[in-house]
């Protein structure tokens, strides 16, 4: 509405339709609050889609309560989510390549098709000629990181219900999910105990920052702000580079990391601070020359977690990989150059076990 002529350009929203048009009132909220709210909504919706996939697969196992079946299904869901995210985030070269691959098969043929795809995603390019791949499969990248390495998982018969659940998930935009929230929602959605209690449980981003900000993040931001006050450019550049190296030298441990939301949000916060450093160092200039040069020094290898639940640990790894991908995209916008995410180059140091016994 134009406040000078309020009678013009007025948008009227009936109270019953408010939930469909809430975005029109975003101006009443802080931009950051609006963004976090959208990320929460997206991540919860994504969690529900994963829940549908999980339930549809679970019905097909001969012994759905067995440890082997549940472990296999957990790994399968993590892989499927990674593929869904990768095609929307541009990590797979062709748009909708995974959804398109799934769509072309009848349910009875989908199981071997998935097994073939997982094999390809775990095979380095030099080893692929031995697989005699179709052009379609050859187009998928090598992922690395061990996500698709275990060939011992059980994939049951795939039904039309499963294919429909995958198709529905394929229509969702996974690119903008919050890995901090989604990791916890994902684990909560598929955790049998939590499911019986009927809800999704996670620590909000706001509450995570109530812990990490006073612990170390506020001090780091203040140090960065102080560097920006340096008037001599050569000295300022030197201090910025030293500060970036300092961030890259920090190590973090969560001895009961769950689905990794504290580690993931800490990583994102440090990478955003690093991007601020790069923005100052680059000053809007395009980098030419060595295409192998990587401006990023903060790595997920600096983050360690211990988790007794193997599935939560797998989710934590995936959340950190998604966070790494999203932050790399933000860095590309800062340094104005393309950076390759795949194959995965950083180790995720999430260890499965009892922290009191390790």
Where are these regions (language model features)?
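Short amphipathic alpha-helical leader/targeting segments
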Residues: 95, 225, 280, 330-331
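Surface-exposed acidic, glycine/proline-enriched linker/cap segments
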Residues: 232-240, 245, 279-298
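Preference for the N-terminal adenyl/adenosyl cofactor-binding alpha/beta module
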Residues: 1, 12-269, 302, 306-315, ...
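SAM-dependent nucleic-acid methyltransferase catalytic core
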Residues: 285-304, 308-358
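Short, charged, amphipathic alpha-helix that recurs within catalytic cores of restriction-modification
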Residues: 1-11, 281
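Post-Walker A helix-loop "phosphate-sensing" segment adjacent to the P-loop in P-loop NTPases
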Residues: 272-277
């Amino acid at each position: 509405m134009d406040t000078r002529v309020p009678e013009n350009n007025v948008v009227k929203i009936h109270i019953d339709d408010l939930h469909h048009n809430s975005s029109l009132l975003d101006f009443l909220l802080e931009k950051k609050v609006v963004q976090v709210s959208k990320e929460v909504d997206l991540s919860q919706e994504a969690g529900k889609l994963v829940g549908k996939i999980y339930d549809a697969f679970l019905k097909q196992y001969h012994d759905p309560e067995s440890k082997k079946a549940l472990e296999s299904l957990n790994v399968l869901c993590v892989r499927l989510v990674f593929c869904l995210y990768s095609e929307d985030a541009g990590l797979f070269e062709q748009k909708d390549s995974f959804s398109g691959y799934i769509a072309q098969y009848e349910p009875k043929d989908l199981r071997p098709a998935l097994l073939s795809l997982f094999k390809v995603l775990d095979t380095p390019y030099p080893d692929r000629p031995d697989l005699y791949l179709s052009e379609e499969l050859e187009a998928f990248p090598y992922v690395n990181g061990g996500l698709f390495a275990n060939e011992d998982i059980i994939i049951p018969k795939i039904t039309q219900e499963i294919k429909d659940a995958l198709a529905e998930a394929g229509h969702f935009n996974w690119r903008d999910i919050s890995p901090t929230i989604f990791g916890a929602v994902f684990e909560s959605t598929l955790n049998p105990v939590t499911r019986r209690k009927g809800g999704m449980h996670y620590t909000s981003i706001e509450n995570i920052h109530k812990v990490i900000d006073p612990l170390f993040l506020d001090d780091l931001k203040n140090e960065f702000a102080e560097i920006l006050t340096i008037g001599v450019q050569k000295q300022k550049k030197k201090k910025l580079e030293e500060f970036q190296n300092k961030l890259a030298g920090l190590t973090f441990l969560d001895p009961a990391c769950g689905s990794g939301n504290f580690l993931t949000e800490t990583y994102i916060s440090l990478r955003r601070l690093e991007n601020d450093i790069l923005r100052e160092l680059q000053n809007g200039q395009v980098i030419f020359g060595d295409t192998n040069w990587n401006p990023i020094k903060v790595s997920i290898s600096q983050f360690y977690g211990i988790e007794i639940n193997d599935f939560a640990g797998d989710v934590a790894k995936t959340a950190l990989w998604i966070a790494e991908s999203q932050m790399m995209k933000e860095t590309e916008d800062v340094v104005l150059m393309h950076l390759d995410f795949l194959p995965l180059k950083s180790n995720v140091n999430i260890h499965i076990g009892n922290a009191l016994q390790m």
